[in-house]
Amino acid sequence: MDDAAKDLGRCAVVLPAGGCGERLGSLTPKQFCTVLGRPLISHTLEAFERASWIKDIIVVVASESLDLMKAIIHKYGHQRVTLVKGGETRHRSIFNGLKVFSENHSDDTAIDKPEVVIIHDAVRPFVDEDFLLQVAKSAKQHGAAGAIRPLVSTVIASSSDGFLDYSLERARHRASEMPQAFQYDVIYRAYLQCTDYDLDFGTECLHLALQYSNVKAKLLEGPPDLWKVTYKRDLYAAESVIKESISQQLCIVTNVKKEAIEVGFLLHENLKLHYKVKAVSSSMCKTIHHLQNIFHGQCCNFICINVKDLDFEETQNLVDLLQTTNASISYPLVIVSVHLTTEDSSSGNKLSGVRKLAKEAHKSNILVYGLLINIDQDKVQLQQTVCEGTAIITALIKDRNPALVGQLMVA
């Protein structure tokens, strides 16, 4: 991706994050609402941090939220972020963010002026790097560019007495979305010429570039994930999208004993229909690199097969290994601790062991669930049991329910 961006020049992003979230119906501004254990804005920052060609991320927040934002940056290890005090309106906040790059900026926070600046919303966490680059390149070529999406509903205008005045042709009109990008001089010059009315009541940055810098923006059809978290239901939708994204790959950790290998193979065959699955021997998992090098990207889901009755050694070793990393800071990790049992085994002792292990692991944002699989069966029955266990594992990974942590389920 860096090679594809090499002709772009220096690029930065401005994220206005000073909204109060009135439409959300919450006292907490929506950018700070928790989504899967993490503030929404942290997910948005992560999306931009993936693009190494973006050199600076300017987050504009209300003065009363500066300390909170600093704490979020520190806790989640965000990089390349500069905080700026916001204005009373969205446009005034964006203008404050742009001023950081100005040669006339007297504050110590002044940083190198970019050739291209991207403007995005802190409450739009789902932005693809490929599309970001497409918008930025179009802005460099044309002066301005922005994402659009088809209108979902027809837009109508009402008369002063509440009757239909006219409607817009939906096939011709589009919804303006984020991200938008500009040559820095184009958008900064436009904001310098804005009236107070523009700064207080305006909504469209692309229009400011057209009105004050005489630059027509190139409009690009964006992907469907560009939606904005506006209402409370959107928080649930955002959490579902994130859960789906971190549930794509799975690692099965097993030892070399015959029973573990057999069950591990059956689980692999069933789970590969739903996930990208890799199976590794527990003897290989001596360091986190052995696990994470299996995948291109972070693995958040693990199945650990324990053979010995009442033994949690394999699962405990995996928990200890994951706790040495920062992997669980960003997202909750799931470990399904599978225990191979026979008719004579005592599940009560296993239950207390799972709960104790899971309670400690949960403090590190690692969700441990227990699953019993009876191996004292013929081949056909075992296959059916493993198939039922696969359904349980799939539900646990998809839902990531902390209320079920430490529970021992039976396939």
From Swiss-Prot:
Primary localization: cytoplasm
Keywords, alphabetical: Cytoplasm, Nucleotidyltransferase, Transferase
Domain of life from the UniProt record: Eukaryota
Residues the record marks as site: Positions substrate for the nucleophilic attack: R170, K228
Site residues (Transition state stabilizer), renumbered to this chain: R23, K30
Signal peptide: none
Enzyme class: transferase
Cellular compartments per GO CC: cytosol
Localization: Cytoplasm, Cytosol
Pfam families named among the record's database cross-references: IspD (PF01128), ISPD_C (PF18706)
Catalysed transformations (reactions): D-ribitol 5-phosphate + CTP + H(+) = CDP-L-ribitol + diphosphate; D-ribose 5-phosphate + CTP + H(+) = CDP-D-ribose + diphosphate; D-ribulose 5-phosphate + CTP + H(+) = CDP-D-ribulose + diphosphate
Recorded metabolic or biological pathway in which this protein acts: Protein modification; protein glycosylation
Biological process (GO), any one: isoprenoid biosynthetic process
EC number: 2.7.7.40
GO MF, one example: protein homodimerization activity
Binding partners and assembly: Homodimer.
Family, per entry: Belongs to the IspD/TarI cytidylyltransferase family. IspD subfamily.
Function: Cytidylyltransferase required for protein O-linked mannosylation. Catalyzes the formation of CDP-ribitol nucleotide sugar from D-ribitol 5-phosphate. CDP-ribitol is a substrate of FKTN during the biosynthesis of the phosphorylated O-mannosyl trisaccharide (N-acetylgalactosamine-beta-3-N-acetylglucosamine-beta-4-(phosphate-6-)mannose), a carbohydrate structure present in alpha-dystroglycan (DAG1), which is required for binding laminin G-like domain-containing extracellular proteins with high affinity.
Protein known as: D-ribitol-5-phosphate cytidylyltransferase
Species this protein is from: Xenopus tropicalis (Western clawed frog)
